Amino acid sequence: MARKTLRARRFFSLIFPFFFITSVYAEQTPVSAKTVTVEAKNETFAPQHPDQYQSWKATSEQSAREDALAEDPRLVILWAGYPFSRDYNKPRGHAYAVTDVRETLRTGAPKTAEDGPLPMACWSCKSPDVARLIQQEGEDGYFHGKWARGGPEIVNDLGCADCHNTASDDFAQGKPALTLSRPYAERAMEAIGKPFDKAGRFDQQSMVCGQCHVEYYFDGKNKAVKFPWDEGMKVENMEQYYDAIAFSDWTNSLSKTPMLKAQHPEYETWSAGIHGKNNVTCIDCHMPKVQNAEGKLYTDHKIGNPFDNFAQTCANCHTQDKASLQKVVAERKQAIHDLKIKVEDQLVHAHFEAKAAWDAGATDAEMKPILNDIRHAQWRWDLAIASHGIHMHAPEEGLRMLGSAMDKAADARTKLARLLATKGITHEIPLPDISTKEKAQKAIGLNMQQINAEKQDFLKTVVPQWEDQARKNGLLSQ
């Protein structure tokens, strides 16, 4: 009877996301320009919400690192000249959010608060300390400066105050008190006609996840986070938006193409799929209601694979058994993967062929339409593959985007063949050996030994200073 009731509820919901280091970090002190109500220390809420806290803490069990570059060295070529060519691991548990952004080679090895390759915005999805700093300094104040400036401040892992208004009476009374703790996310939702304060419970559940599991870019001199949704959320809409403002994340060092790098667009791809269209939320599948030892229901905060809680997730709506659904999902995942690899092969050739054209004396005017095709092809490929769960969220949309990417890449290569022929080059452009991550990185000129050594020195010297300063300022528990 309970299962029938739950299915009925789901049905109706379907109808209606050491010595050389300077002392600059130790000299930083908190700014108290505004009243701050965000408490970033997650353990503060453990006594009040023990089941939720312990299940959130269990995300530390999701500790395995998967090296995406080692698995697929083509990525190194596609991201040549961009920090992702150095290091790209698949995501793991929320408990590692701060650790992973510190340890990734993409954030470099800054020695001072003004040093390093990336802006403050790169902390934005990693910690409730971000919400605290935005409240304390304002958005302009928070985004100002380099990533390293936030080191002594952003120290607590993604947690309670990222998604809940922990200072509210509702939260104190045990209610969800969901909130968009990032103002830029609130503005983005309004841009697509979904103001958070007017949204229903199911919409709010996914919108909270969509603060971070989303495509974004760094806007203006301050490198502030913005979602490119002004024209809509489809891949073509965002492409049109980026083209209109002549935005690029970087220039590929081989082809000289002004590139776009998709982030993790789960909210967009979920919205385009059957679950999103029927308002089956992120929470329904990744954070189901479960029972504690006393039989009390609570929301499981060990965010993970729905198949790990099949009876509480998939079985609420689907009549198929677990093995049958896993087979369907595996087939869709394989189809996405197979087309992904085919697109990557075309793009790898296109980047090296474009380099050959430049080397042969091609002009900007000759290369412009070709680079535009490469840009659009890789953008569509990237938006599909950067959403790791697209085979589950929107497999048809994933295949559509990859098919479009293949067409654009083929257009680029056809134009390149014609252009190269005018330069007297009619033979196939050879590729270097990129059969491993290490060989691919060498092919684009990365000195990985130096990059890794600098990172290890940073982790041994600078990060401990950050943590000491955070404890001194009461931002971390002793």
UniProtKB/Swiss-Prot annotation:
Q: Which residues bind Ca(2+)?
A: 215-216, 261, 263
Signal peptide boundaries: 1-26
MF term (GO), any: heme binding
Q: Which residues bind heme c 2?
A: 160, 163-164, 301
Coiled-coil portions:
none
Q: In which pathway does it act?
A: Nitrogen metabolism; nitrate reduction (assimilation)
Q: Name one GO cellular component term.
A: outer membrane-bounded periplasmic space
- Primary location class: periplasm
Assigned EC number = 1.7.2.2
Keywords of the record:
Calcium, Electron transport, Heme, Iron, Metal-binding, Oxidoreductase, Periplasm, Signal, Transport
Question: Cross-referenced PROSITE patterns, in alphabetical order?
Answer: MULTIHEME_CYTC (PS51008)
Enzyme class, one word? oxidoreductase
Q: Which residues bind heme c 4?
A: 282, 285-286, 393
InterPro entries per UniProt:
Cyt_c552, Cyt_c_NO2Rdtase_formate-dep, Multihaem_cyt_sf
Q: Where in the cell is it found?
A: Periplasm
Name the source's superkingdom.
Bacteria
Q: Which residues bind heme c 3?
A: 94, 209, 212-213
Q: What residues does heme bind to?
A: 122, 125-126
User: An example of a Gene Ontology BP annotation on this entry?
Assistant: anaerobic electron transport chain
Cofactor(s) the protein requires to work: Ca(2+); heme c
Function statement? Catalyzes the reduction of nitrite to ammonia, consuming six electrons in the process.
What is this protein's record name? Cytochrome c-552
The organism that produces this protein has a lineage beginning with: Bacteria, Pseudomonadati, Pseudomonadota, Gammaproteobacteria, Enterobacterales
